[in-house]
């Protein structure tokens, strides 16, 4: 009986370790998706945060891949390449939930996107992004949504969810041309900062 309990405990514990996210990669351009990463650097979830995001998430075959392979597939997808070719803005936020891998993930994502003129990568703590999902927003869109509200905008979460990052940045620029997130300058992920 003890042996069976021990095996159950080990199996249950292993399951929890494997399927508990320690970092989230939030990719916003419209579509908006979030990729959950476990402590073993494996993709354990892919979720869309708007209609386009749900369609895009469903089209990806990255579940249980290493995050490097998953990021490569996402960034090389026709969906993302088409958006970037239309001069859309790509925001990639790496959210650390538990652990220390987010800096490595952020560095990898930054290297992958450094050739794109309209890409911005940054780190967020889970505390900074705790309210995003309750509003139905991905972490990346929530970050700019908060800035819009601090500048006096009355945009709703639903409106923000369906807008492209380029549209949200333009709205922020119109309200506050000095805002880092709204700058009309192109961002490069080589100069990311973990907040």
Where are these regions (language model features)?
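Single-pass transmembrane signal-anchor helices and their membrane-water interface zones
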Residues: 1-23
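Polar, acidic low-complexity tracts enriched in Ser/Thr/Gln/Glu with frequent Gly/Pro and Thr-Pro motifs
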Residues: 16-195
């Amino acid at each position: 009986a003890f042996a069976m309990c021990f095996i159950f405990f080990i199996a249950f514990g292993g399951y929890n370790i494997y399927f508990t996210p320690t970092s989230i990669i939030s990719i916003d351009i419209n579509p908006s998706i979030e990729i959950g990463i476990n402590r073993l650097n494996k993709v354990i979830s892919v979720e869309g945060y708007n209609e386009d995001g749900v369609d895009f998430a469903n089209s990806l075959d990255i579940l249980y891949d290493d995050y490097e392979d998953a990021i490569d597939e996402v960034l090389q997808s026709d969906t993302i390449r088409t958006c970037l070719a239309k001069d859309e803005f790509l925001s990639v936020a790496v959210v650390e939930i538990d652990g220390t891998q987010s800096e490595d993930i952020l560095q990898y994502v930054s290297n992958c996107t450094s050739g794109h003129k309209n890409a911005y990568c940054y780190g967020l703590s889970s505390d900074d992004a705790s309210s995003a999902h309750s509003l139905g927003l991905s972490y990346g869109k929530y970050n700019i949504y908060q800035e819009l509200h601090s500048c006096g905008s009355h945009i709703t979460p639903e409106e923000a969810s369906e807008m492209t990052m380029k549209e949200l940045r333009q709205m922020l620029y119109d309200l506050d041309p000095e805002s880092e997130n709204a700058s009309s300058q192109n961002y490069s992920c080589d100069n990311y900062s973990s907040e």
